[in-house]
Amino acid sequence: MTETAVQPQGLLRRAMDSMQLPKSRTKCFFLFLLSVFFTYAGFHHLFVPDFYVSIMPPWVPWHLELVYLSGVFEVMGGVGVLIPRFRAMAGTGLVALLIAVYPANLHMAFNPHLFPDIPLTALYVRLALQFLAFYWAYTV
């Protein structure tokens, strides 16, 4: 009687198949990149909140609490896009999150004197890149 050894690459293949990843390597790459980007950003909000608190418009209440909340949602969305059952919901949630944080980006662009360490061009480019991020999250 021969014993069948479990092949690690077989386990990995089954795990990857269960994730129902896109067939295109390019789409798969961008899905993982989206996940890493938002998961990293979320943990950054949670562990280094001072910068994010500083960019919030003064009219928004509960600065620290909302920074933590956005960090949690970023991590959830970043992980969620990798789980087929939650992928569409996570993408929609990330779009909602991006819309919710857009006022902070506008605040920075309209008040560059408050952020002298960040070049004005970067503040405006960030506004434009946000629309690319909307599309990216929406199309998962």
Q: What are these model-predicted stretches?
A:
Residues 2-140:
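Membrane-interface extramembranous regions
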